[in-house]
Amino acid sequence: MLSFPKFGHGAVAWVALVPLLSALRALPVLPALLAGLLAGFVQHVGLLYWVTHVVVHYGRLPLALGIPVMMLLALYLSLYTGLFAAGAAFFRNRGIPVVAAAPLLWTVLEYAKSTLLTGFPWENLGHSQYLNLPLIQIADVAGSYGVSFLVVLVNAALAAFVGAGRDGRRRAFVGLAAAGLLLALAGGYGTWRLADVAARFDPVPEQTVALIQGNIDQSIKWDPS
């Protein structure tokens, strides 16, 4: 929540899933599902507060219905977080490391959330990095889902390293190093891409362009009369 507008602290996203992933180490599948539902519900209520204003102001719903509508939407979206947590616990119980399972699970579920039932492609985890221009350049290759994959990979590697015992610390460090390497490669690609685009436009003469945004109230804009 803190990584998105209006807060815009994108760095928080890189550790936001560590508490949930750490808690899953001791949970069977069903309790993990419930933990994911709770975490997702809290997250989406904080992100979707504006839906209440939209359905009340433009949909003409009373506030007593506007708030439950927003909470129902948050509950639906939290199902994907719950499935993520349950899936991570399921694969962990079968010996598949969270560093391998979590990024793939999150990316697949995020794609499903963005496409099923007309889709809800807003507030995806990759969008939290909108201020990190070098990093998000990988979106021209992997889309915003690639950014989400990388964010979850780092979270999973951190959670595995923090929760590893003395015997597993070396393997967890390998996962953390691999995540750091991919992050560095993504940042390096983005830095090169930005420089390449700037070089392409450097010989082009500058031109001044004015753009005026309309300021029409939405309730008037869509009024058929």
Regions found by a protein language model. Name each.
Residues 190-225:
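Soluble catalytic regions of membrane-associated enzymes that act on cell-envelope
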Residues 1-197:
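Membrane-embedded alpha-helical bundles of multi-pass enzymes
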